């Protein structure tokens, strides 16, 4: 999908680069697959802020996405490709042969009218974008997305716009996957994955253009610690402009900006063949 540039009719339009959504459906979403999305503003059940920089934004309804793809051997036709305000990727509405409807993440090159299917063997499914199958039946080198880490749990990785994972090899009961970060990881061969790359790869080339558009997305400003007072942040205070005077920390004094946060005893360490670069 192409990018769209704007004439500089205002400072907010001057540098804006947006996605051209002309190829997407302009019908409303499928009502049976919608759920309410309550806004929290970053507050918990006590009303206290637990996540900063959240609040405001346009009201949304959640689209129920089928990440498990466990309706096997029933072909489904792509009725339309839609915009989803809750994620960077586009979504595809499927009409199954038995009358059921569901949303899936739309892979690149999936078109309206295409047929997709989910299966356990290659007898009933081809290796083409949108089809879902276990890693054990996929050819080595296949580009995939929406990959499970535990069989039956549903896809957890490679779900955002333009992302993909490559199947590099198989050994024993594990598949060797090259993750979007460059990490090489072992995943059980029984885990399901969908063929293809996630749609909307140009999302990373967009420019928001103005602060107000970020507010429409529900994001509030992020204030630097060095411009706060000492009571508010460890970097605060000082006479005139200062650099903070110490290595970067969070408002609670925890090292940040490059400090490794992964647990040294994480069980999944044995499944990581090579760390990300």
Swiss-Prot record:
GO cellular component: large ribosomal subunit
GO molecular-function term, one example from the UniProt record: structural constituent of ribosome
GO biological process, one term: cytoplasmic translation
InterPro entries, per database record: NA-bd_OB-fold, Rib_uL2_dom2, Ribosomal_uL2, Ribosomal_uL2_bac/org-type, Ribosomal_uL2_C, Ribosomal_uL2_CS, Ribosomal_uL2_dom3, Ribosomal_uL2_RNA-bd_dom
Coiled-coil region list: none
Keywords: Ribonucleoprotein, Ribosomal protein, RNA-binding, rRNA-binding
Superkingdom: Bacteria
Magnesium recorded as keyword: no
Bias (Basic and acidic residues): 266-277
Segments of this protein annotated with the region Disordered: 227-277
Self-association and partners: Part of the 50S ribosomal subunit. Forms a bridge to the 30S subunit in the 70S ribosome.
Similarity annotation: Belongs to the universal ribosomal protein uL2 family.
NCBIfam families from the UniProt entry: rplB_bact (TIGR01171)
Physiological role: One of the primary rRNA binding proteins. Required for association of the 30S and 50S subunits to form the 70S ribosome, for tRNA binding and peptide bond formation. It has been suggested to have peptidyltransferase activity; this is somewhat controversial. Makes several contacts with the 16S rRNA in the 70S ribosome.
Protein name (record): Large ribosomal subunit protein uL2
Originating organism: Magnetococcus marinus (strain ATCC BAA-1437 / JCM 17883 / MC-1)
């Amino acid at each position: 999908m192409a990018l769209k540039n704007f004439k500089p009719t205002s400072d907010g339009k001057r540098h804006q680069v947006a996605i051209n959504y002309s190829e997407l459906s302009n019908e409303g979403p499928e009502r049976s697959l919608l759920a309410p999305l309550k806004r929290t503003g970053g507050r918990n059940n006590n009303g206290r802020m637990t996540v900063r920089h959240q609040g405001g934004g346009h009201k949304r309804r959640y689209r129920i996405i089928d990440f498990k793809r466990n309706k096997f051997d029933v072909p489904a036709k792509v009725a339309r490709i839609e915009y989803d305000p809750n994620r960077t990727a586009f979504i595809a509405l499927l009409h199954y042969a038995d009358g059921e409807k569901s949303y899936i993440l739309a892979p690149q090159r999936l078109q309206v009218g295409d047929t997709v299917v989910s299966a356990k063997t290659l007898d009933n499914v081809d290796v083409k974008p949108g089809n879902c199958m276990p890693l054990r039946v996929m050819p080595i080198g296949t580009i995939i997305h929406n990959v499970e880490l535990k069989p039956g749990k549903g896809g957890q990785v490679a779900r955002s716009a333009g992302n993909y994972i490559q199947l590099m090899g198989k050994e024993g009961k594990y598949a060797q996957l090259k993750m979007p970060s460059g990490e090489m990881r072992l995943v059980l061969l029984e885990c399901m994955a969908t063929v293809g790359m996630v749609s909307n790869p140009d999302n990373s080339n967009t420019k928001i253009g103005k602060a107000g558009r970020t507010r429409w997305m529900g994001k509030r400003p992020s204030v630097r610690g060095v411009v706060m007072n000492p009571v508010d942040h460890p970097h605060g205070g000082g006479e005139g402009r200062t650099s903070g005077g110490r290595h970067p920390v969070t408002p609670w004094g925890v090292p940040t900006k490059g400090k490794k946060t992964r647990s040294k005893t994480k069980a999944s360490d044995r499944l990581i063949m090579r760390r990300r670069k």
